[in-house]
Amino acid sequence: MRYIKGRSNLSCTIFVPWDCKNHCKFCTSKQMYKERTCDIDAIIAQIKKINENPLIQEFVLTGGEPLADLEQCQKLIDVMEKPVYINTTFPTFAEIPGTIETAKIMTMIDFINKNDKIGGLNISRHMHQKFYEDVLPINVFAHLIKKHIKLNVVLSKEFNLEEFKQFVEPYRPLENVSICIRADYRNITKDTLKNRDDVFEKLILEYEYESSGGCMVCNDDRFWDGDTLISYHRGLEHSKVVYGNKIFVNDILITIDGQIYDDWDLVTNTEFERWIFGEFKLDEDVSEYENDPVYVDWLLKKNGEEGIL
């Protein structure tokens, strides 16, 4: 089998080795935190290897709740040599429900602003489900954050346009916030991934359509509501695509115990690890890598051969 980069912005998603208090319906990682042992040193060792691979453009920290332990989070960021994006609910971390501890919040915001490696935040705010933890109103703190914020709105029920408009209204004046409607991946198949479904039809009649894009396992439709970007994202449950003897990789996953995988089914594959870490030699057929000369150069030099750049 030959591993191929499936999308231009190939990223490495890392599950932080500490859990959150939420129980989101669509969450795929809750069981992991019950069954596996957290090992930050093993994760750091994998990050250092990933840093070398020029195919991988960025890191994503997810969880769990990355911002629940800023000290440990900083340890992970310190060893990264690529931009990192953080998935978070931006909880209040208050001891008393319904209160906001300003000092803790400002510490969190300073952490984000002062980390040059943090490229942005992906903040979850769901229309039909409340979190177990109190979360901060984005319109209260967004103007204090110097990074882009993508507001992820996961759909768990039928899409109601009027309800959606009311839901996002407080965020429209915020210049550093874009809205991303995310379909429940459990309801998407390869046959419906690129279809103009009911949500798309409602959005295009209400907002200014810009473009559509994506990769083999996801689709993004972009619209504008004045100066506010609204995107509609659909993704498949699995990020790996197999055709013949080729495996197209669209995401790289590192779990809380430092194991690395090519798909969300979390099945170990030593061939994949050799591809990611450059532990194989190119044969005469390198056509799949012609568009990535930097990767070819890195692989050759890693194996003691003369590079091409």
Positions of the model-derived regions?
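Canonical Radical SAM [4Fe-4S] cluster-binding loop centered on the CxxxCxxC motif
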Residues: 1-45
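Short alpha-helix within the catalytic core of nucleotide-sugar-dependent glycosyltransferases
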Residues: 72-74
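Radical SAM enzyme core and accessory elements
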Residues: 1-4, 252, 257-309
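Core AdoMet radical
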Residues: 11, 28-40, 54-69, 81-104, ...
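Radical SAM enzyme [4Fe-4S]-AdoMet core and its adjacent flexible, acidic
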Residues: 126-248, 252, 256-257, 261, ...
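Short, acidic/polar
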Residues: 40-47, 100-112, 160-169
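Leucine-rich repeat
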Residues: 47-52, 76-79, 109-115, 140-143, ...
